[in-house]
Structures are given as structure tokens and as C-alpha cells.
Amino acid sequence: MPKIIIHTNIKDADISTDFEEKVALKVSETINYPLELIHVSVTCGDRMIHNGSRAPMAFVDIDTANKFSEDANPGYTVKFQEFFTKALNIPASRLILHYHATKGSDYGVSRQPPEYKHAEYYV
């Protein structure tokens, strides 16, 4: 169950209204998880500083089970950097991606058919 938490100092009005859906789709395609399992939360207008600058930036935390590794992460980074820099109109130097490897048992969720189809992903 991938969980993506995005903090940015970009104003809500400057981010597309379907940004969360686009993030969920990109994560689904990139790490090969069903779209129905992906949670996205975006906090806009945060007070943020990075490298001494308050220029537009984003900090993206991505938690998921059984996908992140030292070998896989660089490939994910290339895809996520391309996506987020275009979607948020920021340079790669203003984007921080933080991968968190978790276990399925780290999530407390209740998922039942027919709404949730991929039982193999649930504890």
C-alpha cells in the first residue's frame, strides 16, 4: 500500500487540480502497484527552506512494501524526478525524494471486495 506524502511551498492555486490523481498513476506505473492501493496527500503552501532558499520546492515521502532497494531506487528516482519537476515546474535541485521501505504488516487497513480487488497485497 504505497503512501505518498508531498510537502511543498507552492500555493494550491498553482498546482493542477488533478495533481493527486497524476501522482497516484505515476507511482502505480513506476513501482508496479495497483492504483486502488495508492494513497496520496499533498500539503501546499508550507513554509520551507532548502539550501538557504525559499524558492519553490517539494519534499516527497514515499512509503511502500517490497519495492525499494539500493539497486531499484536510482531507476525510480529518474522517473519521479522527471514527473515531479514537470508537474510542479521546479528544477531537480528543488526536489527531495525520500523512500521508506516498509512491510505489509506496517499498515493497519481493512480492504474488502468488491471495491478492493487485489487481496494479495493485504495482510
Where are the predicted features?
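Interaction-mediating elements
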Residues: M1-V123
